[in-house]
UniProtKB/Swiss-Prot annotation:
Glycosylation (residues): 49
UniProt name for this protein: RxLR effector protein CRE5
Signal peptide residues on this chain, from the entry's feature table: 1-19
Gene this chain is encoded by: CRE5
GO molecular function: hydrolase activity; metal ion binding
Main function: Effector that is involved in host plant infection. Contributes to virulence during the early infection stage, by inhibiting plant defense responses induced by both PAMP-triggered immunity (PTI) and effector-triggered immunity (ETI).
Family under the similarity heading: In the N-terminal section; belongs to the RxLR effector family. In the C-terminal section; belongs to the Nudix hydrolase family.
Length: 254
């Protein structure tokens, strides 16, 4: 039933985009608005059967819901590519609607999948949900391979990355952490003083993102700010920046 509703929704998106430039008196006749609209209308009309084939539900196939949704969105994009004479503004509109349709389809499945670990999954953005899904897939592999960080060696908390072309590596002093807490500051009550950095960025879509570090234990779903001990002899800003580079792998200036 969900797949059928998806088909109706995607078809509605296309019909709204087509209706902005042309109207149909019947399945074969076309009312022209302008020359560009005429060419687009012929392309869409010619691909009518193809549209139906692309969106038809595959009977008897046992596939995951997200896989089915992704396939429909991929076929929608391929279908859009057949209309080569689409005006730029209309092409942008169709692309935007297609992206929105993809989010509309995938988001409920990601929320359902991730809610088992994150009880606020329904409040997160689509971009965050996709990142969490990717991390959870990596987590499964790490648990299977027995990968877990340790603080007994200077580089025990760093994941080994095979060198690749164009890879940039931070200076060695930022790749190894100080072992032990003998150099760290403590309060009069014995509590350990910590430093933490808040790193944000704005995507091309205007979305504000914040850098969080996953737990060194892959079995836990915690995400924290890049934080660590505040060593004696250094200012708090320097300590925070050091932790951002050591734990977050991000080079930033204050």
């Amino acid at each position: 039933m969900q797949t059928i509703q998806l088909i109706i929704f995607v078809a509605f998106v296309l019909s709204r985009a087509a209706a902005s430039i042309s109207s149909f008196s019947d399945p074969t006749s076309i009312v022209n608005i302008n020359h560009d609209a005429n060419r687009l209308s012929r392309a869409l009309a010619a691909g009518q059967n193809q549209t139906q084939r692309s969106l038809r539900q595959h009977e008897g196939e046992d596939r995951g819901a997200i896989d089915k949704a992704d396939e429909v969105v991929s076929k929608m994009k391929a279908l859009m590519g057949t209309a080569k004479n689409v005006p730029n503004n209309l092409a942008a509109l169709i692309a935007k609607r297609s992206k929105t349709a993809g989010e509309f389809v995938r988001r409920p499945f990601l929320v359902s999948k991730l809610s088992k670990r994150y009880n606020i999954a329904d409040q997160l953005s689509f971009s965050t949900l996709k990142q969490l899904d990717k991390i959870d897939n990596m987590r499964i592999v790490d648990i299977k391979n027995g990968i877990k960080g340790n603080k007994k060696t200077p580089n025990g908390m760093r994941r080994k990355i095979k060198h690749f072309e164009g890879m940039k590596t931070a200076p060695q002093k930022f790749l190894e952490s100080h072992v032990g807490r003998d150099m760290q500051r403590y309060g009069k009550d014995g509590s350990r003083w910590l430093s933490a950095g808040v790193v944000t960025r704005t995507t091309d879509q205007g979305e504000r993102q914040i850098l969080l570090i996953s737990s060194s234990n892959p079995a836990r779903g915690d995400f924290l700010l890049p934080k660590g001990g505040w060593d004696r002899g250094e200012k708090i800003k320097k300590a925070a920046l050091r932790e951002v580079m050591e734990e977050g792998g991000v080079c930033r200036a204050l």
